Amino acid sequence: MANYIHVPPGSPEVPKLDVTVQDQEEQRCRDGALSLLRHLRPHWDPREVTLQLFTDGITNKLIACYVGDTMEDVVLVRIYGNKTELLVDRDEEVKSFRVLQAHGCAPQLYCTFNNGLCYEFIQGEALDPQHVCNPAIFRLIARQLAKIHAIHAHNGWIPKSNLWLKMGKYFSLIPTGFADENINKRFLSEIPSPQLLQEEMTWMKELLSSLGSPVVLCHNDLLCKNIIYNEKQGDVQFIDYEYSGYNYLAYDIGNHFNEFAGVSDVDYSLYPDRELQGQWLRSYLEAYKEYKGFGSDVTEKEVETLFIQVNQFALASHFFWGLWALIQAKYSTIEFDFLGYAVVRFNQYFKMKPEVTALKMPE
């Protein structure tokens, strides 16, 4: 969903290192990481460097590099997943990272390398579904998302969403079948036909484009593990900007609400109810108006309008990640049931569709 992201003047340049980090064998992975650290932390003794693999990601591999026991200075090395260049524009990702960093919304980006990037580790706890429904935490999340959404486009330029372009690209990349007979049988029986998917995309674009949701700089992938909560400082930070770009404001929130259900063991009974959404959206609108300089008074009508936009755009989120998961099922080397995840997302799309399309905008 990238769309002419402009890096502010004066933003520090990001070095590109001619290093490839192999992630299939532990020793070769370590050798590659140490090659990066020779540039980024030349004072570290390579023999004392600890590498810790984080296992939550389902797009890339993430490794923490540090010396000693305290983890005060940690370099994160993110190795791009196999064929993820089909899904992610890596140049736009770096631009998003730099824009967010310039506005105090992202950690420091140390460098890029041939198959990944390195950045600053944020101290805190990566959240789980039980955290994001806690009012003390979800109000922080709402405010932080509002801060990102309020970032001005360059020179008053009015951005357009690339959601439909990106969705169309993903649709063109979905596999037509799988070599494994059992997987292929499941694919053909449980995934909607390409014709039906095409019809749904056309219908969705017509409905959602008419809702009047502003196009803003969005995170676009605000799952629980991409939110870092620092209890001591009382704040949250978002990480992983590879899907960031200009998109409908309501999509970003609807996508986050879908993520209340989790990723590895999805449970849509955890989708936030109307009361929780009302509190969340009010906190968001108050902060968004403050950041935009519109005061902070929020009416019931504004909350209700955003509620409807968000829940209808949640459909597009299910559809988008359903297509994404089908592509990952074909190419990813990460241990995860991507086909099963696609089934779950498309099933929830069709389950949710009649309920949310029945919602009517307030008079």
Swiss-Prot record:
The species is: Mus musculus (Mouse)
Reaction(s) catalysed by this chain, per the record, are: ethanolamine + ATP = phosphoethanolamine + ADP + H(+)
What EC number(s) would the UniProt record show? 2.7.1.82
Name one molecular function that GO assigns to this entry: ATP binding
Give the coiled coil ranges: none
Q: What is this protein called?
A: Ethanolamine kinase 1
Q: Which GO terms describe its biological process?
A: phosphatidylethanolamine biosynthetic process
Q: Which gene encodes it?
A: Etnk1
Q: Which domain of life is it from?
A: Eukaryota
Key words of the record: ATP-binding, Cytoplasm, Kinase, Lipid biosynthesis, Lipid metabolism, Nucleotide-binding, Phospholipid biosynthesis, Phospholipid metabolism, Transferase
